Amino acid sequence: MPLLSLSLLLLLLQVPAGSAETAAWAVTPERLREWQDKGIFIIQSENLEKCIQASKSTLTLENCKPPNKYMLWKWVSNHRLFNIGGSGCLGLNVSSPEQPLSIYECDSTHVSLKWHCNKKTITGPLQYLVQVKQDNTLVASRKYLHKWVSYMSGGGGICDYLHKDLYTIKGNAHGTPCMFPFQYNQQWHHECTREGREDNLLWCATTSRYERDEKWGFCPDPTSTEVGCDAVWEKDLHSRICYQFNLLSSLSWSEAHSSCQMQGAALLSIADETEENFVRKHLGSEAVEVWMGLNQLDEDAGWQWSDRTPLNYLNWKPEINFEPFVEYHCGTFNAFMPKAWKSRDCESTLPYVCKKYLNPTDHGVVEKDAWKYYATHCEPGWNPHNRNCYKLQKEKKTWNEALQSCQSNNSVLTDITSLAEVEFLVTLLGDENASETWIGLSSHKIPVSFEWSNGSSVTFTNWHTLEPHIFPNRSQLCVSAEQSEGHWKVKNCEETLFYLCKKTGLVLSDTESGCQKGWERHGKFCYKIDTVLRSFDHASSGYYCPPALITITSRFEQAFITSLISSVVKTKDTYFWIALQDQNNTGEYTWKTAGQQLEPVKYTHWNTRQPRYSGGCVVMRGRSHPGRWEVRDCRHFKAMSLCKQPVENREKTKQEEGWPFHPCYLDWESEPGLASCFKVFHSEKVLMKRTWRQAEEFCEEFGAHLASFAHIEEENFVNELLHSKFNRTEERQFWIGFNKRNPLNAGSWEWSDGTPVVSSFLDNSYFGEDARNCAVYKANKTLLPSYCGSKREWICKIPRDVRPKVPPWYQYDAPWLFYQDAEYLFHISASEWSSFEFVCGWLRSDILTIHSAHEQEFIHSKIRALSKYGVNWWIGLREERASDEFRWRDGSPVIYQNWDKGKERSMGLNESQRCGFISSITGLWASEECSISMPSICKRKKVWVIEKKKDIPKQHGTCPKGWLYFDYKCLLLKIPEGPSDWKNWTSAQDFCVEEGGTLVAIENEVEQAFITMNLFGHTTNVWIGLQDDDYEKWLNGRPVSYSNWSPFDTKNIPNHNTTEVQKRIPLCGLLSNNPNFHFTGKWYFEDCREGYGFVCEKMQDASGHSINTSDMYPIPNTLEYGNRTYKIINANMTWYTALKTCLMHGAELASITDQYHQSFLTVILNRVGYAHWIGLFTEDNGLSFDWSDGTKSSFTFWKDDESSFLGDCVFADTSGRWSSTACESYLQGAICQVPTETRLSGRLELCSETSIPWIKFKSNCYSFSTVLESTSFEAAHEFCKKKGSNLLTIKDEAENSFLLEELLAFRSSVQMIWLNAQFDGDNETIKWFDGTPTDQSNWGIRKPEVYHFKPHLCVALRIPEGVWQLSSCQDKKGFICKMEADIHTVKKHPGKGPSHSVIPLTVALTLLVILAISTLSFCMYKHSHIIFGRLAQFRNPYYPSANFSTVHLEENILISDLEKNDQ
């Protein structure tokens, strides 16, 4: 039942007051089609071409334009016609039937509201028909016949939109249908509504007035196929199947079947004993009998499941006798009975169970490959069929003897896995004049479970009428197949029959199929799809489909065709002509074959309410009831065509003889029906754009030419080819071969490959512009003259039968497909997610990320074409930990999402890590355990260039004063001194442009570290050169090959909650300077209009001089950064030696506790060029690590997941990343750190024990015994009060560090704990419950806006990241109790006072930055006095208490002597 929001519809139709009937309102066929899909239509007089409009008193005929809401109608319950605008139903006063018709309350009793449509008439009671009087008013009459159609539907009638009952779920109406319309809250609803429900579920009343009767139920939600297991479903965690137990409903079998179908589900099927036990458990011990999907309603077949599950498991009630088994055709399940299945009268009313698959591709997928023809070679006496060989043994044997006989011939007793194999069996038995044969299906179990003797899964069953009929007390049951339709019967295994053996054959090449290239063979015929849309007259002429359109003679042929057309179906509006036509307008449809001969119809496959009318021609649907036949207008309707011709004894037409057989070579592209192949050479794939002549020469090196268009189909293909690669909004222009360069051609345009010019491709206005002699092609089917010397991208063309040459400079990359600045490689073979992560990484790419709807559409179209049937493909989404948020593996932000609603999460207790996938059928995303095997896609942002690149050595140059040297760049950090210096993103970019640069493009981890280390001591974030509308490309045009996106709050948009508002906000890249190491240096998107600092970049000026890296100034042994002093030790040493050496220098092996110092050391190590020992080690094989100087910190910087398990001692490599190795290993250096203060032990003696243990820190005691308790905020608060304590508060940074260190052990078990904070509405601030302000806070990227704070929200600490988060006070979380210590034993150690240190804020490390001037004189590079004080709101929760001081920068110790001189 289509559901439409009444409020939305009325809003669309509303016009300004006073002009409701007169205001112009544009209606397109698309809009009408949307309404019609929802059952809403406009009634038009076929003869008068006017439309029915309702008013308060009468109905009149008015001009259809402009339409309004009072013209909209809908069939509703009890055959009533409901007017949308008037909120009433069409009624007839039977006591005075000649008076004008009017609109009445839909539950009126004094008028008749029932109407029927009969072809094009509207008929009421006593055969009264809706007629029109001369004054255009509507009346009821028996005298005249007036015809009505649906406006703008191509002549369709209003009978096409009949109402279909919606059976309710749950509620109190026992499953009875919704009553439409029903009145609720003084409003008539013609559809289900969410009004009045907090859970937002759709519901309806089952009587006309809800307030009077209060009968209601939930609606079968058509969107539930996308939602998964919602509130009215229960999920089997193991099978990912949802079940709906409607135990309070009472419906017939067909009504129950309809109810399930409306939810994208089916009546219960039971595939095996495990599933039966699951259902039995949920039904309990009550003797309730429920409908399931088992039925024998197909008169020509036996018992089957309504969802096409193979029927090989059976558990019939043993006392079943033959008579009711024959009489009753629907199956029930009774959990109270061990033998739970029973047949019943299908009209009985019972409860029912629905079933749907969370992943529909797991079920019901027809093997398309089963219908593909494979030429096969077999031994003499064996019959070939699609890769297998069969032999009917005409010596009668029992089933077991037949099995042994086949095995002795290296074959098996045949299995049958598809309808295609059934057709072969029928043909073979017919040729052998045999009526029946044993097949390899048998059961040896109780309950009965049929299995194939070769061990293959039972994926298809084809039972005979009344089968499978189970013999009681029979331990072994065997199955035979009969000849007429290939149906199966259960037999006594001791009977003797012929038997069919099967074994693998030798598959021959496709050329031996007997069909031309592009045609598919089935039986003795070849078939082809002409994908060009044509009228029936053109399609059936014999020219495009020689010799004729297809005739279909059996269900097997129909199934083959249904499979064939699925490969080209793109939209629900895809149709295919077949040869069926009512040529004489008699209403009788016959086949129109070659020679205009009429052929009788032996088989039909009509769709619902078909054939609709006489005189039409027949199409086959491509989607939504695929393969079903429908009547369409022969002249005006356009469709593809299905062609058919015999394999042998055919005469080739002239067109067929010239048909190009060759596929395109390498990575050239074409489509069926085109004689040439094309290749687009665009700027991302070549080293440079070219002039027209250069482009033509480029094509000629392949043996090709610039593209020409021999006919419109070639232009259409090229146009679609461009659309498949580039954004439609891009104004790209490509050289093609169209030119008028030849002076002897009198200025006429010609194609460079000699193709005749068959159309005027250029507008007349362009003729005469003599200087523009070459044409470019735009992706909107436009050709423009251009100057031949301008440089463009280009398109080449080559005949199919010509193999392209391979120029020596060409780098072949065929498997990769380009789309919008990235390339994709589709791996069809299935494997685990981690395998593809490795493969993609090895190919210098990443597992697929999807960042826009266009990219989603591109991926979906490709995997749909590559998947033979419904297949899921891995994408790059993965949980870092079970139940964590999904993140792109390459670190890019998750901005665009296309989750199948409810399927991004595991619904059960399974803690396995999950990864994301995309469905080839729906294109929607869902998640699955990462160990499952699926195909996948690699994506590389660095596009492979097909031309071999000539290496041009880079040269270092100079930077202006005030800029920092990094590699070949100059960087300028602009840190505002106050709010007046803040700049928005656009202003920052303008400033950079004025300085000859752009906002920075961070190209690698070392550059990221260099910028981060220079932000130390400042409090502002900085803009970088990214925008959200193209965040895969830097502002300077380079692709984003390195990224450092924040895993939290990637989009940081305050005060805007709706997606619609967010779309209007420009978002730009910001680099965070939050001291919490989870956020330091991370990127996220911020409103471009906000003010921050920024970083500019430009290339060094190498025009004056350059310098060799050997001229770099050496790094000194002692370095100061922040309030720390580092010593670099250069010598071959083990970790133990490094530890002793540091002690000899009055230092310790370095401990790294935040991202700033990590970034500083990253820059140093990259400059030095080899790995160094640091002070981290483990004594428990990598389970936990400690710093050798006793520092406690949760900060880590591991290289990868495995790098912490390779040894007991840790080093930092040249990228700064940590790895463990054997402590006895020799490295070339170590990093020492000089202690700067007396360290304080945070853990003193335990507090005196009560009923729970306490840990003391400073003057407080803490109980961590309740961290794993899961309770609400109020319950946690009360628990602590009873223990004489309070719920946890965090008053300073040291306390925060202590707590997070203690909580580290719990991070895998609990995610969040409660904090004892509350929202002060008067001051709009967060306060601790004791009234003190929250000076120490850690909200991550930014503090939530005031509007987020609501009475029912509480504050929790998220343990893995150390950030605070708002959460419902009713959520279940762990907690910590805190109280003051009885005795304060903490002795305060005198700390050092403020000191001034020299640190290199602008350390230019890997900075092959060097200035070479002839004087080679030296100059000191000085910087002004800078304060490194951290403000309270930017405290680092993990950083040990430290004394930050004011420092001076003396000189950059990493720049070269020459560089110093140049400054």
Swiss-Prot record:
One record GO biological process: positive regulation of arachidonate secretion
This protein's record includes keyword Transmembrane helix = yes
Molecular function terms, GO-annotated: carbohydrate binding; phospholipase binding; signaling receptor activity
* Residues annotated as transmembrane: 1393-1421
Question: Which residues, renumbered to this chain, are glycosylated?
Answer: 93, 454, 1057
Residues in Ricin B-type lectin domain copies = 38-115
Which stretches are Cytoplasmic in the membrane topology? 1422-1463
Looking at the UniProt record for this protein, which Gene Ontology cellular component terms does it annotate, in alphabetical order? extracellular region; plasma membrane; receptor complex
Maturation and modification? The secretory phospholipase A2 receptor form may be produced by the action of metalloproteinases. It contains all extracellular domains and only lacks transmembrane and cytosolic regions. It is however unclear whether this form is produced by proteolytic cleavage as suggested by some experiments, or by alternative splicing.
Membrane topology designation: Single-pass type I membrane protein
Which keywords annotate this record? Cell membrane, Disulfide bond, Endocytosis, Glycoprotein, Lectin, Membrane, Receptor, Repeat, Secreted, Signal, Transmembrane, Transmembrane helix
**Protein's cellular compartments:** Cell membrane
SUPFAM superfamilies xrefs: C-type lectin-like, Ricin B-like lectins
Q: Which Cys pairs does UniProt list as disulfide-bonded? A: 178-204, 192-219, 260-354, 330-346, 406-501, 478-493, 617-634, 699-796, 774-788, 840-938, 915-930, 992-1096, 1068-1088, 1209-1223, 1280-1377, 1354-1369
Task performed by this protein: Receptor for secretory phospholipase A2 (sPLA2). Also able to bind to snake PA2-like toxins. Although its precise function remains unclear, binding of sPLA2 to its receptor participates in both positive and negative regulation of sPLA2 functions as well as clearance of sPLA2. Binding of sPLA2-IB/PLA2G1B induces various effects depending on the cell type, such as activation of the mitogen-activated protein kinase (MAPK) cascade to induce cell proliferation, the production of lipid mediators, selective release of arachidonic acid in bone marrow-derived mast cells.
What is its quaternary makeup? Answer: Interacts with sPLA2-IB/PLA2G1B; this interaction mediates intracellular signaling as well as clearance of extracellular sPLA2-IB/PLA2G1B via endocytotic pathway. Interacts with sPLA2-X/PLA2G10; this interaction mediates sPLA2-X/PLA2G10 clearance and inactivation.
UniProt remark on domains: C-type lectin domains 3-5 mediate the interaction with phospholipase PLA2G1B.
Q: What is this protein's record name?
A: Secretory phospholipase A2 receptor
What's the name of its gene? PLA2R1
